[in-house]
Amino acid sequence: GGITQCSTRYAKANNKYMKDDYRPDLESIYLMYFDVNSLYGATMCEFLPYGEFSFVDDDAFETLDILNHPDDAEIGYILDCDLNYPPNLHQLHNDLPLAPEHRNPPHSNFKKLMLTLYSKQNYVLHYRNLKLYIKQGLELVKINRVLKFRQSPWLKKYIDLNTQKRQESSNEFEIHFYKLMVNSV
């Protein structure tokens, strides 16, 4: 399932194309709508783990320079770490907090995937996510464990082939077939 959250959605445009509702004395604001296709396929074209999985020795954690580790390096990492969500970010991140986690919402016996502003203990994530979270202001408190692996864009040719075949399709069956070939991986 997807993320469970309560958020406030508010956006108001103000530009010359709004005719009578346009307020020239205020800043011009445009709203954009994006209909993005093949998000799942696009992520599968990235560098993905494929082999030689091993845990990194505890004393080697100190030498890991995750922030400067290239996204397209031959070696990748999944980390178990503790993260602090500084209070100064709470207002800024309130509508879409980082680092989703499975928690029991108030008055519920069932865990949901939730976005919270809580600090995280033993949070498991890919090193690229950790780089993003730190760049956005979360603080890395401690690395508990690190899983190292070889990575490459090993699915890219398969995804690109099915995407091309889907674009060349001349009937609904083929269109759905090639879409399913990507989404079923």
Question: Where are these predicted regions, by residue range?
Answer:
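Conserved acidic
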Residues: 1-185
